[in-house]
C-alpha cells in the first residue's frame, strides 16, 4: 500500500479518429504498438539459458570437422531452434499462460484472503495462549518435574569391581 513509485509497464493508446461510438469492434494495427527492441526478460530470469550454437556445440582444435559441415550444422541448429520454438510457442504459450494466470490468481487469492488473516489471527491470539501455557506449565508440569527430580535425587548407584 502507499504511493506507487514505479512506472507501469502497460500503456493504452487511443486515437480520436480510430475511436468509434458504434457497437462494432475497431481493432488497432498490432504492428503499431509492438516495439521489436523491447526487452522481454528485464529481470534476467532466463540468463542461465544458453541456446547459442557456440554455447551448445564446440569442437576442440585437434578435432575439427569440415568447414561445410560446421556451417551447415550451425545453420540447421539455428533454423530448427527458431522454427521449433515458434511452433511450440504457438501451441503452448497461450494455454500455459492461461494456466499460470489461473495458478497465480488462485495462490494470490489464498494468500490474501486465507493465509494472511490466519497468520494475523494467530499472532493476535498468541499472547493469550502464551499466558495460558505458562500457567499450565507452572501449575502442572513444574510440580511433576520437581517431584520426579526429588525422587530420583535420592537414588544412588554403587558399582563394584568383583
UniProtKB/Swiss-Prot annotation:
Modified sites of kind Phosphotyrosine: 19, 27
Keyword tRNA processing: no
Cytoplasmic side: 1-86, 108-162
Intramembrane segments: 87-107
InterPro entries: Caveolin, Caveolin_CS
One Gene Ontology term of the molecular function aspect: D1 dopamine receptor binding
Locations listed in the record: Nucleus; Cytoplasm; Golgi apparatus membrane; Cell membrane
Residues the record lists as Phosphoserine modifications: 20, 23
GO cellular component term of the entry, any: acrosomal membrane
Main location: nucleus
Reported modifications of this chain: Phosphorylated on serine and tyrosine residues. CAV1 promotes phosphorylation on Ser-23 which then targets the complex to the plasma membrane, lipid rafts and caveolae. Phosphorylation on both Tyr-19 and Tyr-27 is required for insulin-induced 'Ser-727' phosphorylation of STAT3 and its activation. Phosphorylation on Tyr-19 is required for insulin-induced phosphorylation of MAPK1 and DNA binding of STAT3. Tyrosine phosphorylation is induced by both EGF and insulin.
GO biological process, one term: viral release from host cell
Superkingdom per UniProt: Eukaryota
Keywords: Cell membrane, Cytoplasm, Golgi apparatus, Membrane, Nucleus, Phosphoprotein
Entry membrane topology: Peripheral membrane protein
Record's function text: May act as a scaffolding protein within caveolar membranes. Interacts directly with G-protein alpha subunits and can functionally regulate their activity. Acts as an accessory protein in conjunction with CAV1 in targeting to lipid rafts and driving caveolae formation. Positive regulator of cellular mitogenesis of the MAPK signaling pathway. Required for the insulin-stimulated nuclear translocation and activation of MAPK1 and STAT3, and the subsequent regulation of cell cycle progression.
Subunit composition and interactions: Monomer or homodimer. Interacts with CAV1; the interaction forms a stable heterooligomeric complex that is required for targeting to lipid rafts and for caveolae formation. Tyrosine phosphorylated forms do not form heterooligomers with the Tyr-19-phosphorylated form existing as a monomer or dimer, and the Tyr-27-form as a monomer only. Interacts (tyrosine phosphorylated form) with the SH2 domain-containing proteins, RASA1, NCK1 and SRC. Interacts (tyrosine phosphorylated form) with INSR, the interaction (Tyr-27-phosphorylated form) is increased on insulin stimulation.
Family the UniProt entry places it in: Belongs to the caveolin family.
Record's protein name: Caveolin-2
Amino acid at each position: 500500500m502507499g504511493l506507487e513509485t514505479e512506472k507501469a509497464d502497460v500503456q493504452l493508446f487511443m486515437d480520436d479518429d480510430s475511436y468509434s461510438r458504434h457497437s462494432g469492434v475497431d481493432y488497432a494495427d498490432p504492428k503499431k504498438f509492438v516495439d521489436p527492441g523491447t526487452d522481454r526478460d528485464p529481470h534476467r530470469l532466463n540468463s542461465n539459458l544458453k541456446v547459442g550454437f557456440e554455447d551448445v556445440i564446440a569442437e576442440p582444435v585437434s578435432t575439427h570437422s569440415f568447414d561445410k559441415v560446421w556451417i551447415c550444422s550451425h545453420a540447421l541448429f539455428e533454423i530448427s531452434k527458431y522454427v521449433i520454438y515458434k511452433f511450440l510457442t504457438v501451441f503452448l504459450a497461450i494455454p500455459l499462460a492461461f494456466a499460470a494466470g489461473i495458478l497465480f490468481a488462485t495462490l494470490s487469492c489464498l494468500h490474501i484472503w486465507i493465509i494472511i488473516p490466519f497468520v494475523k489471527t494467530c499472532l493476535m491470539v498468541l499472547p493469550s495462549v502464551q499466558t495460558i501455557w505458562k500457567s499450565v506449565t507452572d501449575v502442572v508440569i513444574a510440580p511433576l518435574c520437581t517431584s520426579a527430580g526429588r525422587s530420583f535425587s535420592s537414588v544412588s548407584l554403587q558399582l563394584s569391581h568383583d
